[in-house]
A protein has these predicted regions:
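Short capping segments at the starts of secondary-structure elements
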Residues: 47-51
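Short, locally clustered residues in the helix-turn-helix/winged-helix DNA-binding domain
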Residues: 14-17, 42-46, 106
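Charged, amphipathic alpha-helical coiled-coil/dimerization segments
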Residues: 21, 71-130
Length: 142
């Protein structure tokens, strides 16, 4: 059966999210990382010391998903946590192994970016990225 044009925004956006996730996770291949884990590494590389809550907010995932994602990257030795000013707070940084993994995978990730742009066209891809950010920002704001 071919892909259906769904009547609601939620279903349509989930179709796009699944298709994009498949494209990016193919390039991650045997690394063992999923797209959300790679994204978490990217964010921690740019902003070390984020709390679990801050990371969740930065990438637009719920607290439970962020906790699970960070536990997996910690288990893989890619990030480590320490107690923040509040004993319940965890602050996260990449380990040297995490930094190496990120550098190793970055060319593959960029290849996925190029493949995405090639399939959609650069202008359409950039427009979709902008519209996605605007929608997420507006829908997630209180």
């Amino acid at each position: 059966m071919k892909l259906l044009s769904l009547p609601c925004y939620c279903g349509s956006l989930r179709q796009v999210a699944r298709a994009v996730t498949v494209l990016y996770e193919q390039v991650l291949g045997e690394s063992g990382l999923h797209a959300t884990q790679y994204t978490a590494l990217q964010v921690l590389d740019e902003a070390p010391g984020l709390t679990t809550t801050e990371l969740a907010q930065a990438i637009g995932i719920d607290q439970t998903t962020a906790t699970r994602t960070l536990a997996l990257v910690k288990k893989g030795g890619l990030a480590t946590d320490s107690v923040g000013s509040d004993r319940r707070e965890r602050r996260w940084v990449l380990t040297s192994k995490g930094q190496t993994q990120l550098r190793t995978l970055r060319p593959r990730w960029e290849a996925a970016q190029e493949a995405f742009e090639k399939r959609l066209g650069r202008r359409a891809a950039m427009a979709l990225k902008r519209a996605s950010y605007q929608a997420a920002s507006r829908l997630m704001s209180n």
